[in-house]
A protein has these predicted regions:
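CN hydrolase (nitrilase-like) catalytic-core segments centered on the catalytic cysteine
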Residues: 97, 102, 110
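Acidic beta-strand-loop-alpha-helix segment within the catalytic core
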Residues: 1-86, 134-150
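Acidic donor-binding loop at a coil-to-helix junction in glycosyltransferase catalytic cores
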Residues: 106
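Acidic, metal-binding active-site segment of PIN/NYN-like and related structure-specific nucleases
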Residues: 119-135, 139
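Short active-site alpha-helical segment characteristic of glycosyltransferases
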Residues: 49, 110-111
Length: 150
């Protein structure tokens, strides 16, 4: 269960873009040493949202209809392929929100801390199975609107 763990330090490296994302609990989030902040987008119609698909039939059944609903309501939907990068891109304002169901703790712990230190909201809920979560990560302005689509 998530509450049993506390992330003190988050580091995510993207070797393709040579980008290092870092944050220390209580501090500021940084990209290659420069402080980053989440976007200020406050409506779905102007937002860029990433959705992730964990490797399970249940997740696929649940997320495909959500993908269709998001596609009709947001500016753009993106599939990052990496939970850590979707979280860090949300932290830097490249994305406005990220949604995934059935993701593992080790995929989201570092990026979640980086997002929170950048002023974002990292909402997560434990699911059945060890260290598995449902999450909505956002700039702090869009979670409730995304929840209504779920």
């Amino acid at each position: 269960h998530w509450d049993d763990y506390l992330t003190e330090l988050g580091v995510v490296y993207d070797p393709f873009l040579d980008e290092m994302w870092t944050a220390k609990s209580g501090g500021k989030a940084r990209l290659n040493g420069r402080v980053i902040r989440v976007s200020e987008t406050d409506n779905l119609e102007s937002s860029v949202v990433s959705i992730g698909f964990a490797k399970s039939k249940t997740t696929l059944k649940r997320n495909l209809p959500l993908f269709a609903r998001l596609y009709q309501r947001v500016l753009k939907v993106r599939l990052m392929g990496s939970a850590a990068l979707a979280l860090t891109w949300t932290a830097a304002g490249r994305l406005d929100a990220y949604r995934e169901n059935g993701i593992s703790l080790w995929d989201i712990a570092a990026g979640g801390l980086i997002l929170e230190c950048a002023g974002g909201e990292f909402w997560r809920q434990p699911l059945r199975g060890k260290y598995t979560y449902e999450l909505i990560a956002s700039n702090g302005r869009l979670r409730k609107r995304i929840e209504r689509l779920i």
